[in-house]
């Protein structure tokens, strides 16, 4: 189904955004 592809794409984007945010927070804390 098309909506499954959309959800998968949103999930992937959210995952990458979350990792990027965590990385930024970790960098900020370690400095």
Swiss-Prot record:
The keyword Acyltransferase belongs to this UniProt entry's keyword annotation = no
Tissue specificity: Expressed by the skin glands.
* InterPro entries attached to this UniProt entry: Dermaseptin_dom
Its chief place of residence is: secreted
Taxonomically, the superkingdom here is Eukaryota
Q: Keyword Secreted, does the record have it?
A: yes
Annotated Gene Ontology cellular components are: extracellular region
**Any single Pfam family the record assigns to this protein:** DD_K
Q: Localized where?
A: Secreted
Positions carrying Glutamic acid 1-amide: 31
A Gene Ontology BP annotation from the UniProt entry: defense response
* Keyword annotations from UniProtKB, A to Z: Amidation, Amphibian defense peptide, Antimicrobial, Secreted
Q: So what family is this one in?
A: Belongs to the frog skin active peptide (FSAP) family. Dermaseptin subfamily.
Query: Any idea what job this protein has?
Result: Has antimicrobial activity.
Protein's name according to its UniProt entry: Dermaseptin-7.2TR
In its UniProt entry, the species of origin is given as Phyllomedusa trinitatis (Trinidad leaf frog)
């Amino acid at each position: 189904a098309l909506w499954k592809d959309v959800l998968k794409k949103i999930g992937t984007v959210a995952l990458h955004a979350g990792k990027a945010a965590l990385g930024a927070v970790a960098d900020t804390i370690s400095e």
